[in-house]
């Protein structure tokens, strides 16, 4: 042991020793509470543990009082298919035939601004390990990305690094990236959002949970060695404040606060874990992500039926001279912590050797209720684990509707100049699809492997992705993620429901039945009452919406302090929806022209709704008014029609309507199918409203002419509005709006696909 180590005995004998708790993010009263819990001052290692585990990121101390609403509103019927939910590493849902799917979305926002490549890459790696920790094989990833204005000076640096990081890590893991969403807005300058979703598949009986039980069971750390990367994010942990000479402290301050990922280590770690699960060698397991060993040990111990002893000096290190505080707080990637019975340790180690994965017994489960950590024989941590992992501070932050909200709502898009001629309508279309907001994302998705492993059935950016789960039966899943910061700023409750509705609709448009929800709630500072009002309203909106739709929230993530200076980002609740499809061969594609002779039918009602729209932003740089109405009962009906139509082969293509309205969906489906079409707008309809309205609850479908009558009868029987608006012209080279304008596919493709390469290529 070196002289710089602060032991429990030393802490007890030096009660007045000054400690840098404020620099570590702890408030005066939080530090006082730690002293009260321990009956003494904490050691440096204990202070490190409490500071990271009581952080906003780990403890949810500002959001917990609001997040409880999800549990309060979830009915037993909604929970019926849920095998694991909020509080676990990821939600798990029974999808039938003995299969289960686990999925979750998490943020890696701040690291992705500091070091975009590694921030995004380790964001993917972290969420993949969450899925692995449930006993599942990861099968797909998606991403929700937000950047500053596309032409802003720093956007290129962040965009390039994030996209390369996601692709570099995911491609190396052999995981298909099956969709997502990319948005550019000035509010995200200096604070990009990188939200990564991963889904995994397992047999129901193979589910694993994070807990340590059975006195005498061994704690095994396996995967990469532990280094100093990731520590800078918790301020002075790597500095001389914890002892050591000035030169050593100065050098450590230069270490990266962003973790460094190695996807090839994670790839063998995945296979190693799956073999360990198959051999039934694991009692409990936890991945090491945020807060590292501090989190893994305290969460495993507090979720079990005993205590835990850890010999911290047995942790394999890749840096010399690390202190206990640094070892506990390191966020080095590609590490897992397992609970293993003594008789299975040798077999566990043999599997790890087979995969060339480093594994070390670092401790054991004990009787009692203490987490005790030693360093070269001396105790540096002796705490009740629940006080670290689950009993941190909980705040009821002030909540206040902003004084500016009424003025924002009053500033509607109603008075904005609209295109008044056919030529102006045509130019509006070209301006919209040629803007960074609605242009093609192919420049991004081409950097991702969407079809690796051979089970990807559908992978359309901004729509749902479909993955085959069972090769024999064709059973599969659909996933979609959506968010609208613009709508949520105008009305947080409705904005969250619109995001839910769009993700739900995207899943249904593929032919799948939506069954469960995950979320990642990205907001500004919780110390701002206006931000907390946005947050609380968004949580209520999402929870109430799930009740109406009858599907549960299985888990999620909260990311606060997303702001530049005192200016917060647009409030961005990202919603992910999981759907189940009995036979992926019946999935509905996006592109026109899969069947000869198709009629285009618009499902749902169109209203004059342009507040918060992309048209208002592109044409007038305007944001104000009230978002489109949301009718979740109608969304449910729409989904039922689409899944029935998919099953019966009545629909050959489908595309939800959202940003950019009908004409945006038409252009994307025409380009996807490489075939033109003719639109005939309803008699008396305002062409601008018909083409560009962003009314929710609508889907454009292509129906084989032989099935048109049957499909329309189905819609009529279910009282779902459906109107014929055109035909697909196979062999045609243009999109024509009869009586208004025509644009060739070549011109549309050139404009639509040239924007991002021009900006970032």
UniProtKB/Swiss-Prot annotation:
Its main location: cytoplasm. One of its GO terms (biological process) is 'de novo' IMP biosynthetic process. Mg(2+) 2 binds at residues 130, 287. Transmembrane segments: none annotated. Pfam families: AIRS (PF00586), AIRS_C (PF02769), FGAR-AT_linker (PF18072). GO terms for molecular function: ATP binding; magnesium ion binding; phosphoribosylformylglycinamidine synthase activity. GO terms for cellular component: cytoplasm. Keywords: ATP-binding, Cytoplasm, Ligase, Magnesium, Metal-binding, Nucleotide-binding, Purine biosynthesis. CDD domains: PurL_repeat1, PurL_repeat2. InterPro entries: PRibForGlyAmidine_synth_PurL, PurL_linker, PurM-like_C_dom, PurM-like_C_sf, PurM-like_N, PurM-like_N_sf. Substrate binds at residues 107-110, 129, 259, 331-333, 559. Pathway: Purine metabolism; IMP biosynthesis via de novo pathway; 5-amino-1-(5-phospho-D-ribosyl)imidazole from N(2)-formyl-N(1)-(5-phospho-D-ribosyl)glycinamide: step 1/2. Its EC number is 6.3.5.3. Residues 1-13 have a biased composition (Polar residues). The active site is at 57, 108 (proton acceptor). It catalyses: N(2)-formyl-N(1)-(5-phospho-beta-D-ribosyl)glycinamide + L-glutamine + ATP + H2O = 2-formamido-N(1)-(5-O-phospho-beta-D-ribosyl)acetamidine + L-glutamate + ADP + phosphate + H(+). ATP binds at residues 60, 104, 519, 556. Residues 1-23 are annotated as: Disordered. Mg(2+) 1 binds at residues 106, 557. It is found in: Cytoplasm. Monomer. Part of the FGAM synthase complex composed of 1 PurL, 1 PurQ and 2 PurS subunits. Part of the phosphoribosylformylglycinamidine synthase complex involved in the purines biosynthetic pathway. Catalyzes the ATP-dependent conversion of formylglycinamide ribonucleotide (FGAR) and glutamine to yield formylglycinamidine ribonucleotide (FGAM) and glutamate. The FGAM synthase complex is composed of three subunits. PurQ produces an ammonia molecule by converting glutamine to glutamate. PurL transfers the ammonia molecule to FGAR to form FGAM in an ATP-dependent manner. Belongs to the FGAMS family. This is Phosphoribosylformylglycinamidine synthase subunit PurL. It comes from Mycobacteroides abscessus (strain ATCC 19977 / DSM 44196 / CCUG 20993 / CIP 104536 / JCM 13569 / NCTC 13031 / TMC 1543 / L948) (Mycobacterium abscessus).
